[in-house]
Amino acid sequence: ALLHHGLNCAKGVLA
């Protein structure tokens, strides 16, 4: 769950 959240957060910030 944490890993998924980190990837999602990074993608959201980058996008």
Swiss-Prot record:
GO terms for cellular component: extracellular region. The modification Alanine amide is found at A15. It holds the Pfam family Antimicrobial13. Keywords: Amidation, Antibiotic, Antimicrobial, Disulfide bond, Secreted. Transmembrane segments: none annotated. It is found in: Secreted. InterPro entries: Antimicrobial13 (IPR012516). One of its GO terms (biological process) is defense response to bacterium. Antimicrobial activity against S.aureus and P.aeruginosa, possibly by attacking the bacterial cell membrane. Heterodimer with subunit A; disulfide-linked. This is Halocidin subunit B. It comes from Halocynthia aurantium (Sea peach).
